[in-house]
Amino acid sequence: MSRIPSINSTSAYESSVPQFGRRSGPVALLLPLSGPFAPVGRSMEQAAKLAFAASGAPPLDVRNTQGTPEGAAGAAQAAISAGDGLILGPLTASAAEAVGPIAHAANVNVLAFSNDENIAKPGLWPLGISPGQQVRRVIAAAAASGKTRTAAILPRSPFGQLMGTALRKEAKRLGETAPQIGFYDPSSFASLTRTVRSITNFDARGAGLEARIRAARDQDDEAGRLLAAKLALEPIPPPPFDTLLLAAHGETLAEIATLLPYYDVGPPQVQIVGPMLWAREAQAMATHQALVGGLYAAPPPALRGAFVQKFESVYGTKPPAIDDLAFDAAAIAVLAAHEGGYTTRVLTNPTGFFGTDGVLVLQPNGKVRRGLAVFRVKPGGPQLVAPAPHELPPDIVPAR
């Protein structure tokens, strides 16, 4: 973890940010070390301890949340009573929301491991790579290539809702027409089929061509028959969008891949885009012609190489991706301890940090900006379309 060198003065920034947070003390690490998520918590604990092995690191106070909001609240209260100056974790959004008010009342900042941007507030930063961050990056990439009319086919789930909300916001920010969004029941293929048919406006598109063919046949002469035959060879008009956001993966994505050609949706008229989850499925996706060329935003895999190597050398196994958050949060804590403490001014310096998954900037309002790369699904493996930025332009948002 390192600071990104700044070429801009930050004096105006520093005067606008409240000096919230403690300057010193041990760092609390709140994780589910018992219950169903204990294996996740134990692995994240190992990742955090790697960062705290650095020379001059503050003491690390590991506490068990028991995998519940109530347990997280109790762990936070105990950590604060013990004099801890910063909280890393907890894992989930509900647990982080339980910890937030307790920490804020005690003048303690929180770096949570959730990826839900909705819980962000001054003093509480969700560090996970959020659906919103992914959508903003990939929709902007599509817009840069001239695709500006968006639509989405999303599961009726919390993840789908977050993707839909992010798409609406990004389309508005780019000055695009409000997107058409269809939600389907993830457990029903019939619901999925209806949603695809509706969003693609297939009935109207196909009906118009069919009506012209029938009218030609109704002429009941040679000219009409020739026209009908010619019209039958014409493609169905394109759908009313040129960018289609999908949130599905696995079997559901494969099902969508069979439906899209049937409803005449695909390249070059339509750019398919999707979530970071596609990074681990890109090669399988490339076996479906409808998905070849699809775009997704994700951290460059090579960036986490040093962390993976360090983790594997110490623990003898490869770390799951979620461990990146624990390592980066811990590294930020160690760096902040050397730079003046765990205050909002230190944590939200607009130069940001360069971590395991690339550049990230914590903002005073609790939002987190990330620099993600954009990849294209190709038969030979994912193709880098737009590299991840090494720094993000200033975008100072005041605390509210």
Show where each model-derived region lies.
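Extracytosolic ligand-binding ectodomains
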Residues: M1-R400
